[in-house]
Swiss-Prot record:
Essential for respiratory growth and required for mitochondrial protein synthesis. Required for vacuolar acidification. Its main location: mitochondrion. Belongs to the RRG1 family. It comes from Lachancea thermotolerans (strain ATCC 56472 / CBS 6340 / NRRL Y-8284). It comes from the Eukaryota. It is found in: Mitochondrion. GO terms for cellular component: mitochondrion. Residues 93-112 are annotated as: Disordered. The keyword Mitochondrion applies. The keyword Membrane does not apply. Keywords: Mitochondrion. This is Required for respiratory growth protein 1, mitochondrial.
């Protein structure tokens, strides 16, 4: 009999992947904290609400709209994303009503990301000045837009400029050797200003994930061998009881606390021989798993000394120094040629525009 899609593990995994993908997208692609909170809340609520929904058509529409929401977030279409969320946050639609994605075209437009960002900047600027008694509590909206917004953007850009200056004073960025553990193995890599975040090697991420999966399988196999070994010990104890009419006094944990305990007890008589006959295959499997783990650890340790410390570290150190020198030249050019002529109230000559022209 064919299972209903709601009982399939792959369906649950698919929905979970889309949910996590949505959370990553909204964290990276939008500046609005309100929109971030709305996406997280409405997406989670909708998924929980339809957890027991058995209608394949209903689930198809929900997944289609979730895909559309991610497309809006990736393309910075926050207005469309907001409208889609608004339709899902309303009361349930009557029968025969159009789906949320169809009704998007008739919804009013909302503010663009730049306007939302400027609103946050001017709000922080006004609150900070009011706390210092530099601005009145009541300010007309026209004054905020025409008078205070350019000053707020200038102040925001000036803070960024001071941050850039403080980083340049510290000198070229350092090249650090880091590692992540995958069982006994340590996977070594370089962390620099050149290859950070999205510029980090994708192959490195694939290697780390692959090794962690392999290590988890190794742990799972080890646990299975331990469980099978305990059952094997009980079989050996029964065999010993049938042959000698005596019970074994030790516990099965003795043989798994120390992997060589069976060798030390090899001359103790038939009881140890019976235990050895049952446990030797298990110990062979454990030895093989340990050898694989040690081999991987030795490989990555050798890779660290032969590759990471020998060639890659010097290569990235040179690239980091070159990047620092280019950044320093651009900063000095900004200070000498453009900074003296900065004016907050001219869009082509304000500090943010000047910094952008120098790639800051």
């Amino acid at each position: 009999m064919v299972l209903h899609f709601s009982n399939l593990a792959r369906h649950k995994t698919f929905v979970l992947h889309w949910y996590r993908y949505t959370l990553r997208n909204v964290a990276r692609q939008t500046f609005s904290w309100h929109l971030k909170a709305r996406v997280k809340d409405i997406t989670r609520t909708t998924i929980v609400k339809h957890k027991s929904d058995k209608s394949s058509w209903s689930i198809y529409i929900l997944l289609r709209d979730l895909k559309a929401l991610n497309g809006f977030l990736r393309n910075k279409k926050t207005a469309a994303a907001w409208r889609l969320l608004t339709l899902y946050s309303k009361k349930p639609l009557r029968s025969g009503a159009s789906s949320p994605s169809v009704a998007l075209e008739h919804s009013p437009p909302l503010q663009d990301p730049e306007t939302v960002r400027n609103s946050h900047i001017i709000h922080s600027y006004i609150v900070e000045r009011q706390q210092k008694n530099l601005l009145p509590l009541e300010i007309p909206a026209e004054y905020k837009t025409l008078l205070l917004l350019p000053l707020a953007l200038h102040d925001h850009a000036l803070k960024r400029l001071h941050l850039i200056e403080s980083k340049l004073v510290r000198g070229p960025p350092k090249v650090s050797v880091n590692y992540t553990s995958a069982g006994k193995a340590r996977i070594w890599f370089l962390r620099t200003a050149v290859n950070k975040n999205q510029r980090q090697s994708k192959a490195l991420g694939q290697i780390i994930r692959r090794e962690k999966r392999k290590n988890q399988k190794n742990i799972d196999y080890w646990e299975k061998c331990r469980v099978n070994g305990i059952w094997a010990w009980h079989e050996a104890a029964w065999e010993h009881l049938m042959e000698t009419n005596t019970m074994l006094t030790e516990s099965p944990a003795k043989y798994f606390d120390n992997e060589r305990s069976r060798k030390r007890a090899a001359s103790d008589g038939t009881s140890v021989k019976a235990v050895a006959e049952w446990l030797d295959p298990v110990f062979s499997s454990l030895d093989m798993l340990q050898a694989q783990s040690a081999e991987q650890a030795a490989y990555f340790e050798q890779y660290k000394h032969n590759t990471v410390l020998q060639g890659l570290q010097q290569f990235f150190a040179r690239k980091s120094d070159k990047m620092y020198q280019n950044r320093k030249k651009r900063f000095e050019s900004l200070l000498e040629n453009d900074l003296p002529f900065v004016t907050p109230y001219f869009s082509q000559q304000n500090l943010a525009t000047v910094m952008k022209s120098h790639k800051f």
